[in-house]
């Protein structure tokens, strides 16, 4: 995904567009799961963490600073959740 496309999706998600947020999830679900798996070393825990991460992201998307990369933000949420 290009940075420009990601920025458009984030902007739409911040405005309440669920389809845009769903696309962000699809684009980042593998990396979130893999980071959680590396940190937790257990696949079921990594799945649970992934769900929690995207729930936190959804609840806090309004606070996301669009000058930052969404991928960096979601990675940080993942690391903090683990």
Question: Model-flagged regions — what are they?
Answer:
Residues 2, 14-23, 33-52:
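Short, charged helix-capping/linker segments at alpha-helix termini
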Residues 4-7:
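Acidic, Ser/Thr- and Pro/Gly-rich low-complexity regulatory segments
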Residues 10-11:
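Amphipathic alpha-helical repeat scaffolds
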Residues 14-15, 41, 54-69:
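Sigma70-family region 2
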Residues 24-28, 32, 78:
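Hydrophobic/aromatic residues within well-ordered alpha-helical segments
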Residues 26, 47, 58:
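Conserved catalytic core of two-component sensor histidine kinases
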Residues 32, 39, 57, 61, ...:
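Hydrophobic recognition helices of helix-based DNA-binding modules
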Residues 34, 48-55, 68-80:
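Structural recognition of an alpha-helix C-terminal capping motif at a helix-to-coil junction
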């Amino acid at each position: 995904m290009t940075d420009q496309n990601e920025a458009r999706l984030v902007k739409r998600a911040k405005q309440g567009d669920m389809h845009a947020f769903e696309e962000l999830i699809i684009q980042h679900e593998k990396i979130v799961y893999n980071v959680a798996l590396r940190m937790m070393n257990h696949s079921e825990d990594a799945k649970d963490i992934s769900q929690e991460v995207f729930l936190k992201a959804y609840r806090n998307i309004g606070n996301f600073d669009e000058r930052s990369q969404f991928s960096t933000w979601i990675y940080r949420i993942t690391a903090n959740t683990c």
